[in-house]
Amino acid sequence: MVQGFDPTLILWLNLIGTFVFGLSGGLAAVRARLDLFGVLVLALVVALAGGITRDLLIGTPPATFRDWRYLAAGGAAGLVTFAARPVLERIWNVIQVFDAAGLALFCVTGAAKAVEFRLGPAPAIILGAITGIGGGMLRDVLIRQIPTVLKHDLYAIPALAGAAVVVGAHGAGSNSLAFPFIGFAVCFTMRLVGLRFNIQLPIAPSERRTKSGAVEVPRAPDGPADGGSFSQRP
């Protein structure tokens, strides 16, 4: 747990983030024409897989299996998505804002938990990012897509940046409560700016030969990115 934070507050913030991430998985499942069970599975995967992966890599029992409320939040998100998809579609921009907040929260708390277990700076930053993006990556694998965080959308980078703030502050010997908030703000702001201005990471051009034998190097697409774990509609 982040030092100095009210454990009850952190719990409820994590549950809110779990619910919002569950909406992402549920919407992806509904669009993939999965049945109710499939919707629930994908909602739980997106909501919980990042934290489970982090805890297993650290070597501690996953928090998901020690507190039933995490499973309840993810499952509730799946049921809400299954029953109310049209409503969720209409408020998509609002959900994206909450998702950005969930990503920021999870990367900060994930990095803080790794630091508590005395991991080095690089592993702690990576585990912080995994906490935020791991569920979306597994979701894409289950619906047979290239994980969207591996493409050119700003999703993993903000998570890494937010986690780096927390880990860097700890490495400098600071226990100030300001740094978790700063890490949250960095990740949250980067994510929203990336969405607002469609900021994308560059991709390598691919070579293609024309009928005359000349090499044609196509430009990278100018359209919107496929999105991160929740950047666009899954």
Which role does the model predict for each range below?
Residues 43-51, 74, 99-112, 130, ...:
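Small-residue-rich segments of transmembrane alpha-helices in multi-pass membrane proteins
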Residues 41-45, 52-58, 126, 130, ...:
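Short, structured motif recognition centered on aromatic/hydrophobic residues
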Residues 37-45, 66-72, 92-103, 123-127, ...:
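Cytoplasmic-side transmembrane-helix entry/capping segments in multi-pass membrane proteins
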Residues 1-9, 56-66, 110-123, 168-179:
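Helix-coil boundary and interhelical linker segments in multi-pass alpha-helical membrane proteins
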